[in-house]
Amino acid sequence: MSDLEPLDPTLQNILDQKSLKWIFCGGKGGVGKTTTSCSLAVQLAACRESVLLISTDPAHNLSDAFSQKFGKDATKVNGFDNLYAMEIDPNGSLQEMIESSDQTGGMGGMMQDLAFAIPGVDEAMGFAEIMKHVKSMEFSVIVFDTAPTGHTLRFLSFPSVLEKALGKLSTLGGKFGPMIQQMQSMFGGGAPQEDMFAKLESMREIITEVNNQFKDPEKTTFVCVCISEFLSLYETERLIQELTSYEIDTHNIVVNQLLFPKAGDNCEQCSVRHNMQQKYLKEAYDLYEDEFHIVKLPLLTEEVRGVEKIKEFSKMLTQPYTPPQ
């Protein structure tokens, strides 16, 4: 450990940074990402004009957390005037986009099949469609409850994926353009290759613009959520390295589900688990204390569900938790 004064062990720094537009909460499955992202959104709602909370995790836990049904449209969270939530499936939104815009007949379908044969294009376009939708809604700050680590940073490769798709379509168009146009005139309809090309190009522009914002520490930060165990800490280190390689700012770690046994408690399992957690917590401090705000949150005796419990829990993000003596 260094002699430097440790950073404030709260997420107050995020609330104070008014320039932030995009905040991601990510980590391994089951470490409390959703509770953390919901709690952070609640705290942001108290100091920012309007907040949108988005789940891109296929499990979609926002509805469970707030005990309120959310879908693909931004819906006001009960009890708030300026906090909205939505649950989206990138692949689902892509399918809807195709179905609603496929007016080009059979050849249009063929061009889409050719484009989607490139790995990742479907996800990339789904993500672009979501970002287009989100950008059209004027929110002060957007909080992402992301899919478990591994899927979290997939979107960073999307611009190059779409570049490949554009290149492939362009080549195909050059080779088969006259034949496609002849067949198209027989089938009737518009020019599918140009339509598809224009669609991919507009998606690529959106993703490139958004990715540039994601790499701006004034606009974007990533909150790593973990528990004090070997695998979770290892995953967090990998996540931080990956974020650093993509130039995405991260300087907050939430360590969730910590045990604080009461004095005189004879629970052997609690004691063993507490000692294990303290060992990995020390490792986390050794690794990150100089550059990260490390927030410690307790293991609770009941689930954090419903607005009131989330509000109560969210206070621990801005005021360090003190275990009862």
UniProtKB/Swiss-Prot annotation:
Q: Main EC class of this protein?
A: hydrolase
Q: Keywords on this record?
A: ATP-binding, Cytoplasm, Endoplasmic reticulum, Hydrolase, Metal-binding, Nucleotide-binding, Transport, Zinc
- Which InterPro entries does the record match to this protein? Anion-transp_ATPase-like_dom (IPR025723), ATPase_ArsA/GET3 (IPR016300), ATPase_ArsA/GET3_euk (IPR027542), P-loop_NTPase (IPR027417)
The molecular function GO annotations come to: ATP binding; ATP hydrolysis activity; metal ion binding
In which residues is Zn(2+) bound?
267, 270
Where does this protein have coiled-coil stretches? none
Q: Is Cell membrane one of the keywords?
A: no
Detail which positions bind ATP.
28-35, 229, 256
Superkingdom of source? Eukaryota
Q: What does this protein do?
A: ATPase required for the post-translational delivery of tail-anchored (TA) proteins to the endoplasmic reticulum. Recognizes and selectively binds the transmembrane domain of TA proteins in the cytosol. This complex then targets to the endoplasmic reticulum by membrane-bound receptors, where the tail-anchored protein is released for insertion. This process is regulated by ATP binding and hydrolysis. ATP binding drives the homodimer towards the closed dimer state, facilitating recognition of newly synthesized TA membrane proteins. ATP hydrolysis is required for insertion.
HAMAP family registered for this protein in UniProt: Asna1_Get3 (MF_03112)
Family membership: Belongs to the arsA ATPase family.
**Name listed for the protein in its UniProt record:** ATPase GET3
> What is the organism field in this record?
Cryptococcus neoformans var. neoformans serotype D (strain JEC21 / ATCC MYA-565) (Filobasidiella neoformans)
Name the gene. Answer: GET3
